[in-house]
């Protein structure tokens, strides 16, 4: 079992534009949070192996298994917002699943960005995110132009 998990996650790397954007946001004092669905041990291991743990406050990681609320239940998002001390209008949720990520976030009034890079085909396109991005370079540009963040180009 250990060998299986080691092999499964050994090749897990973030896309080349993820870490630079997260570092820029972190350096700018922007709170970076994660809302993820799955077993706590597996999701925590993914975050660790992706090398992102130094950029995310552990108190801003919300794993459905640990909280006891699954996506797409908006209560999972409400819990995250409350614990982070944010109103929905102060948050931008980036997700790759229109039904499980974007719809619940939008229902609460959060800003949303649908990442199409790893999105599975056949999603309910009647659900419309505020922004559609192909990669995190596009997300950075959106953060600069729409939300006025002073971020470097990468």
Language model feature labels by segment:
Residues 19, 23, 31, 35, ...:
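Asp-based, Mg2+/Mn2+-dependent phosphohydrolase catalytic module
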Residues 1-17:
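Metal-dependent phosphoesterase signature
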């Amino acid at each position: 079992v250990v060998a299986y998990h080691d092999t499964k996650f050994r090749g897990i790397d973030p896309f080349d534009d993820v870490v630079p954007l997260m570092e820029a946001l972190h350096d700018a004092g922007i709170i970076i949070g994660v809302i993820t669905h799955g077993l706590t041990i597996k999701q925590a291991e993914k975050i660790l192996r992706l090398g992102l743990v130094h950029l995310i406050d552990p108190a801003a990681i919300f794993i459905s298994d640990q909280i006891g609320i699954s996506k797409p239940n908006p209560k999972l998002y409400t819990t995250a917002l409350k614990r982070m001390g944010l109103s929905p209008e102060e948050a931008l949720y980036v997700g790759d699943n229109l039904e499980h990520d974007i719809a619940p976030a939008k229902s609460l009034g959060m800003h949303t960005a649908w990442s199409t890079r790893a999105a599975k085909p056949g999603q309910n396109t009647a659900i419309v995110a505020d922004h559609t991005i192909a990669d995190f370079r596009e997300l950075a540009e959106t953060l600069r132009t729409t939300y006025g963040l002073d971020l470097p180009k990468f």
